[in-house]
């Protein structure tokens, strides 16, 4: 039986994060973690964090080997140079964009095409660990999805290149509407930073 814990607060933290948009079929897009690309964010249900110590930074092709997994997030996980488990979000769109600029972007996840990378707001709850620029949480779900026309990405060895989505933006917005949260099409890359 799992031990009952009284939550620290009732309202979720609202942060910013980046997702990959993956086309599993022509009519089904899903959000995936930009760092743990194989982690799909399910529609209409919360994502629960797991300690993935053995597959840290899989989208960049780096595998970190560690001890046994534990409940996530954990205060001690990540100390001494580890990955620090949990669902990540930054406190501001600016910090999220800074985090994104030099990050590798895969073109496929498990054989499905990555059609875009997007920013958005995410609700975090359960056990939440605060850091200087954001949080790591036990549970998360998109609160708003922001679709820019392009995102500056690192692809292969080229850092700072611009990639256009491989599907029309309106189609991406329609298919991501299944998450049941506001989906915003943006006119320019900087627009999410003004909100």
Name each region found by the language model.
Residues 93-106, 168-175:
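A short, charged, amphipathic alpha-helix used as a generic interaction element across diverse proteins
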Residues 134-195:
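Active-site-proximal loop/hinge segments that shape catalytic or ion-binding/gating pockets
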Residues 40, 89, 111, 162-165, ...:
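Intrinsic-disorder-associated interaction segments
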Residues 120, 130-135:
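Conserved inter-motif catalytic segment of the P-loop NTP-binding fold
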Residues 83-91:
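A short, exposed loop/beta-hairpin motif centered on an aromatic-Gly-Thr core
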Residues 114-116, 139:
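A short, structural micro-pattern
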Residues 90-91, 120-125:
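Short His-Asn-centered micro-motif
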Residues 1-83, 101-114, 126-128, 149-156:
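ADP-ribose/NAD+-binding catalytic cleft of ART/PARP-like enzymes
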């Amino acid at each position: 039986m799992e031990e009952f814990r009284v939550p620290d607060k009732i309202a979720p933290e609202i942060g910013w994060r980046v997702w990959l948009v993956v086309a599993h079929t022509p009519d089904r897009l899903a959000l995936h973690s930009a760092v743990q690309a194989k982690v799909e964010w399910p529609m209409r249900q919360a994502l629960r964090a797991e300690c993935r110590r053995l597959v840290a930074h899989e989208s960049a092709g780096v595998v970190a080997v560690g001890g046994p997994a534990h409940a996530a997030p954990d205060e001690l996980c990540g100390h001494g140079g580890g990955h620090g488990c949990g669902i990540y979000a930054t406190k501001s769109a600016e910090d999220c964009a800074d985090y994104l600029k030099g990050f590798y972007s895969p073109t496929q996840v498990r054989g499905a095409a990555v059609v875009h990378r997007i920013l958005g707001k995410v609700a975090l709850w359960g056990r939440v660990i605060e850091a200087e620029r954001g949080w790591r949480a036990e549970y998360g779900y998109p609160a708003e999805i922001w679709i820019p026309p392009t995102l500056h990405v690192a692809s292969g060895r080229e850092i700072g290149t611009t990639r256009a989505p491989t599907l029309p933006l309106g189609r991406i917005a329609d298919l991501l509407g299944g998450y049941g949260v506001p989906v915003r099409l943006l006119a320019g890359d900087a627009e999410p930073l003004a909100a």
